[in-house]
């Protein structure tokens, strides 16, 4: 009797942009077409995998949908950083609704189920979503740097419109980067001479072309990981330096107000930094595994249990990045936490009245010309200021 081959998600290569990692056995010279291996995952392992995928999909859809709803239904949350964060949520939803369920089918079905068109469309969506995530975080870091360096700069009246255009440009750039993936992706078959087995996979290059594998994996690692995170690191180094200097140069008479302002800027910058760290942590194992397969002689399936576990771990961790952002915001932002609870339990968020103690009476000197005399006269008027009436609007609220 012929030996059956292991059915695993990495029968060929691991890729963040295509389904070479999801290729399945098409035929064996000594067995029926489409049969998988005796050492395939047991029923317990498959149940654990599917439960994990189901949790990622359901929790991710719920969290991102509530985040988007909070943004559109709450006027005070429609700020510059929140526009980028909402765009991030749309990208995550796209991945959760398409690519994650498709990836889950690879553990149950044998062979690529979605045809040549499905291969191209899903490869395009996957890379677009990854691009939206990392490029949005990059431009959001640049925005936070500008907010820290020029905290008192009044935003133009069309700041929201400009930010929406920037977010749209991120999507366009991501689609442009993903377009070659859609053009060249196809369902390829290749043969493992060691086990006399033919594999089928959705990939952006013929799997037998070793040089193309290496170029593809290296470009993905550079464009969608190393370069954006390097730019973000530069911005956050400058943010840290600016905040440190501003802390040292606070005048004594303005210390209370200035420290509150610095704390607010630090809180928003910290929120963005957490989102960046989550992206870097979640996607690193998948990138490393893809590079390992591309630059080593390990072209075909590695039957070891450790390799299978690490493959599952890297994929689950990468997909988990699409569901953790709303909960990171819930943990970091009391404002978002309040609105998140209100939307989750279908109740109205409380809008606290400003305390009387926060109002202040200010005396202003006004000089004007006395009618009929032509003489200048100075008068004093009293102005009561209330919270929220400062020159700088709440455009940085998260």
From Swiss-Prot:
One of its GO terms (biological process) is G protein-coupled receptor signaling pathway. It comes from the Eukaryota. GO terms for molecular function: bombesin receptor activity; neuropeptide receptor activity. The keyword Signal does not apply. CDD domains: 7tmA_BRS-3. It is found in: Cell membrane. Glycans are attached at residues 10, 18. PANTHER family: BOMBESIN RECEPTOR SUBTYPE-3 (PTHR45695:SF6), LEUCOKININ RECEPTOR-RELATED (PTHR45695). This is Bombesin receptor subtype-3. It comes from Macaca mulatta. The gene is BRS3.
């Amino acid at each position: 009797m012929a030996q059956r081959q292991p059915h695993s998600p990495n029968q060929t290569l691991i890729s963040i942009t295509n389904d070479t990692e999801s290729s399945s056995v098409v035929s064996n010279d000594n067995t029926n077409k489409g049969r998988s291996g005796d050492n395939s995952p047991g029923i317990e392992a498959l149940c654990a995998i599917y439960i994990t995928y189901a949790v990622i999909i359901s929790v991710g859809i719920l969290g991102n949908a509530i985040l988007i709803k909070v943004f559109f239904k709450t006027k005070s949350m429609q700020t510059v950083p929140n526009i980028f964060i909402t765009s991030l949520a749309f990208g995550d939803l796209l991945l959760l609704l398409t690519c994650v369920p498709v990836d889950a089918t690879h553990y149950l079905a044998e062979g690529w189920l979605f045809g040549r068109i499905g291969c191209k469309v899903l490869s395009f969506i996957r890379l677009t979503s990854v691009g939206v995530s990392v490029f949005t975080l990059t431009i959001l870091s640049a925005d936070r740097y500008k907010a820290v360096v020029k905290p008192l700069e009044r935003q133009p009246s069309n700041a929201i419109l400009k930010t929406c255009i920037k977010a749209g440009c991120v999507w366009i750039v991501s689609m442009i980067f993903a377009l070659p993936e859609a053009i060249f992706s196809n369902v390829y078959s290749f043969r493992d001479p060691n086990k006399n087995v033919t594999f089928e996979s959705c990939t952006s290059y013929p799997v037998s072309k070793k040089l193309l594998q290496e170029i593809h994996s290296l470009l993905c690692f550079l464009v969608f990981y190393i370069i954006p995170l390097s730019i973000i690191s530069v911005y956050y180094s400058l943010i840290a330096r600016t905040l440190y200097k501003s802390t040292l140069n606070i005048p004594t008479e303005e210390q209370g107000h200035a420290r509150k302002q610095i704390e607010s800027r630090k809180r928003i910058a910290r929120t963005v930094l957490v989102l960046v760290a989550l992206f870097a942590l979640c996607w690193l194992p998948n990138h490393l595994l893809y590079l390992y397969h591309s630059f080593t002689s390990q072209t075909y399936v590695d039957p070891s249990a450790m390799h299978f576990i690490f493959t599952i771990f890297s994929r689950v961790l990468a997909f988990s990045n699409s569901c953790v952002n709303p909960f990171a915001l819930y943990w970091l932002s009391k404002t978002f936490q309040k609105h998140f609870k209100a939307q989750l339990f279908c109740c109205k968020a409380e809008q606290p009245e400003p305390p009387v103690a926060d109002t202040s009476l200010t005396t202003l000197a006004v000089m004007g010309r006395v009618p009929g005399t032509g003489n200048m006269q100075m008068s004093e008027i009293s102005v009561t200021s209330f919270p929220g009436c400062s020159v700088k609007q709440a455009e940085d609220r998260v």
